[in-house]
Amino acid sequence: MEQKLIRKRQDEFEAEGKEYAAYYDNEETILEERSKVPYLHFGSFDRQEWLQLSFSTRLGGVSDGYLSSLNLGWDRGEGRENVCENYRRYCESIGADHQKLVLSDQVHETTVKYVDPNFCAGANIEKKLKAVDGMLTDIPELLLATSYADCVPLFFCDPKKKIIASSHSGWKGTVAGIGEVTVHKMQEMGCTLSDIEVLIGPSICQSCYEVSGD
């Protein structure tokens, strides 16, 4: 089998008064640094004009100290207003309405839920889903916001049915098959397997990944 070598490239940029370098191991990952809040987007999904996929960095927010500066986690001991402001800034940078965010508590399981406007975070940016690691929808303008540390992001779309999904795949979710569960949920909504496109987002590499004995 022929193996294609993908060259690693480096982008240098300045943010918050500091110099940074970003490394990529593929040609589909693009760092958007023209806005106040830098973010990643991906060529394969950019070609789908009906959807937008972006991935935050830790730059461009209001958080201090080790959380500097775009902390989007609610359980890091930071004041709620800072986290909300970071969400507002990020959504503004990608041209989206923060009130249409859909947020969930992720628990490393395989629950994938269909979401509609009833689950939107609203002006106060409230998390309305509990114990959900994957979301899917066919409603335009909803922002499915899933969170990752070193876990694997899985993004799905069906260009024909205009259905999207996003799943958080830690090692437990990966072993339990959350990717397969997400695809099955899309099929239940009428998607054909061959029409579903999947993108694996940025995550920790194998050489750096450590897990406990279980």
What residue spans do the PLM features occupy?
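Active-site microenvironment for binding and transforming phosphate-containing groups
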Residues: 1-214
